[in-house]
Design a protein with these regions (language model features):
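Conserved class I S-adenosyl-L-methionine
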Residues: 1-53
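Conserved beta-strand signature within the Rossmann-like core of class I S-adenosyl-L-methionine
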Residues: 142-149
Length: 205
């Protein structure tokens, strides 16, 4: 399954990754606003969220008065983010794009975000360099990129399977168990994201 297809499929349920998504939106908005003010000043308000997802970071910043444009490879995720912004009456500008080729003009933003471990989805160091160069193209002089990534340890032997449980979530009146399963192949791993109703009915993942 491609990265785009994976996140298209996950978009309706992506909020279940968080124990309380609404609380996380507000908390991340506050944390990012503080980091932006600290590193780029209190007048840095034009933000490009180049890994928008369902809007976890963008919605929090919009609620704090930032001007946010969001882009993502997944049309399903962008559609969900647009809907969440409308519900909250927040002016999200959004588009579908690969962050290695962003259809925005150069030096248009104070800050570009790449959050929620988006950068490691790329296959090679060359792809990562291309993505970083493209994000830097989009920021004004004196601006910058803000990236959040998982703090990976050294990879285990090939074939190692790691199970990372998220616990139980309540959604639409039903309870679900969530977990990630990582199957390591050298320095990379195949990911399975499993969302299973407690009653055992089919849920996808």
């Amino acid at each position: 399954m491609s990265v785009r297809a994976f996140y298209d499929d996950l978009a309706p349920r992506y909020h279940l990754v968080y124990e309380d998504w609404e609380t996380s939106v507000a908390r991340q908005g506050g944390a990012l606003a503080s980091l932006i003010a600290e590193h780029w000043g209190v007048n840095a308000h034009a933000v490009l969220d180049a890994a928008l997802g369902i809007g976890t970071q963008a919605l929090g910043l919009l609620a704090r008065g930032f001007r946010v444009t969001g882009s993502d490879l997944s049309i399903g995720a962008v559609t969900r983010a647009r809907r969440e912004a409308v519900v909250r009456r927040l002016p999200l500008v959004s588009l579908v794009a690969d962050f290695r080729a962003l259809p925005v003009r150069s030096a248009a933003f104070d800050v570009v975000l790449l959050c929620d471990n988006s950068l490691p989805h790329l296959d090679s160091e060359a792809d990562i360099q291309e993505a970083l160069a493209e994000c830097l193209r989009c920021v004004r002089r004196g601006g910058g990129c803000l990236i959040s990534m998982r703090d990976y340890e050294s990879p285990p032997p090939t074939g190692t399977v790691e199970v990372r449980p998220y616990g139980e979530r309540l959604w639409a009146g039903r309870r679900y168990h969530l977990r990630q399963v990582w199957t390591w192949r050298g320095p990379r791993y195949d990911l399975s994201f499993e969302i299973t109703p407690v009653d055992g009915a089919e849920a996808g993942g």
